[in-house]
Amino acid sequence: MGEQLKKQPVLRGGGFTFKQFFVAHDRCAMKVGTDGVLLGAWVPVLHARRVLDIGCGSGLIALMIAQRSLPQVQIDGVELEPAAAQQASSNVELSPWAERIHIHQQDIHQFAENHPHQYDLIVSNPPYFAPAIACRDEARDTARYTGSLTHDALLNCAEKLITEDGMFCVVLPHELGIEFARLAGQQGWFVRCQVDIRDRPGKPLHRMLLTLSRQAGETVYQHLALRQSEGVYSPEFCQLISDFYLNY
């Protein structure tokens, strides 16, 4: 490890300080949260060469993947909301991986139609609320509601952009994850890994991590409790976040 990485991170407001980078999110509708951290820490990066983050928000997941992946891996983040895209670009510029991450302020449908590259890893922390009740904040509405990007459209865009043997990874509320997997199956995707997540043992399942592929293969099913019964982080969750969270 270089001397730069041995220095203690400087704690700042308006965002979240990780061990190797800072994510400002004061201009983003969706803040740094457990869902994004889970996805960024969990996705399989070993064989990735080109990575796409759909709806990248503050750039959190792209930055986490950059930290975990090989130096030659290139990462594109696509974000529709202008303020979030600008903040993601700023976060990237201040990170150790500015040469590897590129933020595009663009609709993913246009990006999918016009972008020449295909990706062997695509990730997304997608919108999941139905648009029956609008948020007061238009940017937050875009970030949280499927009216801006339906799950059907997300799967279609991913199909256009993924390599033949690429992986598409998402995090969703558990019930919606079941529906997303069903919809994906109707569109020719195969579930290759499913992680059912609960806050602690005995509590209801509340999140799901999914890895999809266009290629059939064995499905791996796993379970994760974020905390132990007494409320402290579980060893499994600590292992996921140990390279990112301070004091772990």
UniProtKB/Swiss-Prot annotation:
Its EC number is 2.1.1.223. One of its GO terms (molecular function) is nucleic acid binding. It is found in: Cytoplasm. Transmembrane segments: none annotated. GO terms for cellular component: cytoplasm. It comes from the Bacteria. It holds the Pfam family MTS. Its main location: cytoplasm. GO terms for biological process: methylation; tRNA processing. NCBIfam families: tRm6a37MtseTrmN. This is tRNA1(Val) (adenine(37)-N6)-methyltransferase.
